[in-house]
């Protein structure tokens, strides 16, 4: 038991360190090759922050731990909005840009609804005799299609947008080429090995305590893979730049569904078992709550009181999951 917990923690460390080194090496190399900081931020850095969720969901799907794969994504999205959004707003009220309200938040809500529609064949398929909910390879390709549209749209908007004051314009670090390659290769190895340890130990811990893999995925695994987003958002709030937090949260949620579940289910279909329709509805309700606070009540500002409501919502959802054990 103690060994499983240590391996679980080691897996988290390897995943986060691997993502950091991979992002550092790849982004520095890309900037040396002439890519702008904005393009690097929209692609490599965004991928780096979503790498923990990607590797964990992918490894879970390959190993047959479908509930961890799906629970990780649904749980991460809920954690991002309620826990990270709530904590960040408590540190400093969050100002939301007009573009985020008009474009990114609606896209996030669309991704939630698309995933719910594709996942619940017994409700939406309309096929007699359908008794199992599966995110199939074809549906995975559909999610990847949405991701390509999202990426193309984002680049098109970015070209016409003014220069992002938060983009990384720091001087390119003078790392030797061999060290950059070591960062990239070492980061990938750490991600894969850490992901394997993380998933295997999480599954073992669930069996030891008699907990379902969906519970582990929705809670511990989701929180663990969301640590980069939590660190980034809280750090931004402490630096008096809390507006970065919502873009970080919303972008991560879109990546989680369109890219991560798209790749995972394309490689191996994911059966929807322990993750219930209620979990999907909590995710959708969280997104609607964020939108309501931003548009209807907050005049593009999520205040501390609203942050407290988000955080309490996460606590209530976690208590509900514990009561279902």
List the model feature ranges, each with a label.
Residues 1-325:
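Hydrophobic alpha-helical segments, chiefly the membrane-spanning helices
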């Amino acid at each position: 038991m103690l060994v499983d917990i240590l391996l679980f923690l080691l897996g988290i460390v390897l995943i986060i360190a691997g993502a950091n080194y991979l992002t550092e090496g790849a982004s520095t190399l890309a900037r040396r090759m002439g890519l702008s900081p904005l393009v690097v931020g929209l692609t490599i850095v965004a991928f780096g922050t979503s790498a923990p969720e990607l590797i964990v969901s992918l490894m879970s799907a390959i190993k047959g731990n479908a509930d961890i794969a799906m629970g990780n994504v649904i749980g991460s999205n809920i954690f991002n909005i309620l826990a990270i959004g709530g904590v960040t707003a408590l540190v400093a009220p969050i100002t939301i840009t007009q573009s985020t309200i008009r474009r990114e938040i609606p896209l996030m809500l669309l991704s939630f609804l698309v995933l719910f529609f594709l996942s619940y064949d017994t409700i939406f398929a309309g096929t007699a005799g359908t008794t199992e909910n599966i995110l199939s390879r074809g549906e995975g390709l559909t999610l990847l299609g949405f991701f390509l549209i999202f990426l193309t749209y984002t680049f098109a908007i970015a070209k016409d947008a003014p220069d992002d004051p938060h983009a990384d314009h720091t001087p390119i670090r003078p790392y030797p080429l061999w060290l950059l390659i070591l960062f990239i290769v070492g980061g990938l190895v750490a991600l894969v090995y850490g992901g394997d340890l993380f998933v295997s130990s999480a599954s073992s811990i669930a069996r030891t305590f008699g907990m379902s893999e969906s519970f582990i995925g929705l809670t511990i695994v989701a929180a663990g893979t969301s640590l980069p987003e939590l660190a980034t958002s809280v750090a931004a709030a402490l630096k008096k730049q809390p507006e970065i937090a919502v873009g970080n949260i919303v972008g991560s949620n879109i990546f989680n569904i369109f890219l991560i579940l798209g790749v995972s289910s394309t490689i191996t279909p994911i059966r929807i078992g322990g993750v219930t329709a209620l979990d999907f509805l909590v995710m959708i309700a969280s997104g609607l709550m964020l939108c309501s606070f931003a548009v209807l009540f907050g005049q593009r500002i999520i205040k501390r009181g609203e942050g407290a409501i988000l955080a309490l919502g996460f606590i209530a959802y976690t208590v509900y999951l514990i009561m279902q054990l």
